[in-house]
Structure formats: structure tokens, C-alpha cells
């Protein structure tokens, strides 16, 4: 369980497990009633929000995704997908999430067929 208070943040990172392939996840358990004043961009709210950062380049590629957050939302993404959480302000309430990771035993040679 991760708890964040105002002005705290979780910098961009990835997860690893015992295997090369795996999944990370986050479930939203509690959100503050406000994330406070936006300092970076009023039109795109970022305070206290999860941002998933892709590795794609190109004119039609979306390099990041900021999912809408509601209580009990559950997001699953690959281990090696960078992600971060921005700080929030203006409240003493807590942002609480549950994070979980799991290895995926995948063999690309054995799993090539369309069986």
C-alpha cells in the first residue's frame, strides 16, 4: 500500500521481477477531495495523477497516457513501462493506492503458433 501526502511524488520508474517479462498494477483506494492548484498546465491536470510513459516515437504516436482516476480503478501495464505520480497540494488528505507486480512466464519460441 502506498500513501502520498501533499508535495510528495513518485518519480518515473519501472519494475522488475524474477523473470524478464511481467506486469505491474495499481488500484486506486483513496483520493483527496482536491489535488490543489495546478502549477504546470491548467488545461491538463496533473497534480496527484498517475502518468504512464510510453517508448514510442513518431508523429502519430502517443508517448504518454494519464488515465482518469476514480476509486477502485485498477490499471495493469508491463513491467518495463515507465510511470510516475505527480505531487498534489492544498489539502492534508492522503492519496492511497495498492501496487502489485507479477512475473509472466512467457517463452516466445514455444508460444509462436496460433494454437
For each predicted feature, which ranges?
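Short, surface-exposed secondary-structure boundary micro-motifs
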Residues: 80-81, 103
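A short alpha/beta connector and helix-capping loop motif
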Residues: 91-102
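Catalytic core of non-heme Fe(II) oxygenases with the double-stranded beta-helix
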Residues: 2-76, 84-86, 93-94, 108-113
